[in-house]
């Protein structure tokens, strides 16, 4: 078995005291599973890809936010024009007297879901701070380190203020069209989603919404929802003893045979083979 790839501090931080660094991924390519000697925030700007975090797959796209601990294992697969920022930091180097743990701990939502979403307003504010942080963090003098840490604090507070978890039944509250749609899709893993009803409810034109969604994510709305459901099915196949028919129902598929066809088309193997590969309990 190959040894685990570990990303080292020395390869990313210019000095032993530098607290935070911005690593842009324009684009993020396929990247093998790895851990780190540091922690990171991952914020996705556009495109899509498969982010596998601690063996759980997530189809990620614009607005997705992850708090990654040093010991977390993750990789990027099946990327499509995926653009993101990694804000990497060393907790032991942070000097400001604030509750960093509360701001940066890996928070979990319903069912332990570590994925958060950032509202459109939050993305605009975060982008402005990250641009400043990217300019300041490479400087090696003490004042620059202090300013970089202050900007990092501002970013952490911005993320905390504007994040939400649609899978937990919450949404962005008052938000722009794409925020509302993402929240609705996140709450539709096991129930049908009616785009026409959604547009009527929020008085939104359907065609421009479809175009906006594809422009921002690189997918159609139905493709994205299908990917969310398949990722959920992969997780349940590995970590539960539910029958495959029960998993199909929990992932929005009324017909288990159709579920098997879609799952096989998306992953290359049948649900049963997927479960066997991971040594999960048989359905």
Curated annotation (Swiss-Prot):
Taxonomic lineage from the root: Bacteria, Pseudomonadati, Pseudomonadota, Gammaproteobacteria, Enterobacterales
One Pfam family named in its UniProt record: AraC_binding
Keywords for this protein: Activator, Cytoplasm, DNA-binding, Repeat, Rhamnose metabolism, Transcription, Transcription regulation
Any one cellular-component term (Gene Ontology): cytoplasm
Tagged with keyword Cytoplasm: yes
Name the UniProt record assigns to this protein: HTH-type transcriptional activator RhaR
Entry keyword Cytoplasm: yes
Record function comment: Activates expression of the rhaSR operon in response to L-rhamnose.
Residue span(s) of domain HTH araC/xylS-type: 179-277
Top-level taxonomic group: Bacteria
DNA-binding interval(s): 196-217, 244-267
Subunit structure: Binds DNA as a dimer.
Subcellular localization: Cytoplasm
Site (Interaction with sigma-70) residue list: 246
PROSITE patterns: HTH_ARAC_FAMILY_1, HTH_ARAC_FAMILY_2
Gene3D superfamilies registered for this protein in UniProt: Homeodomain-like, Jelly Rolls
CDD domains, per the entry: cupin_RhaR_RhaS-like_N
A molecular-function term among this protein's GO annotations: DNA-binding transcription factor activity
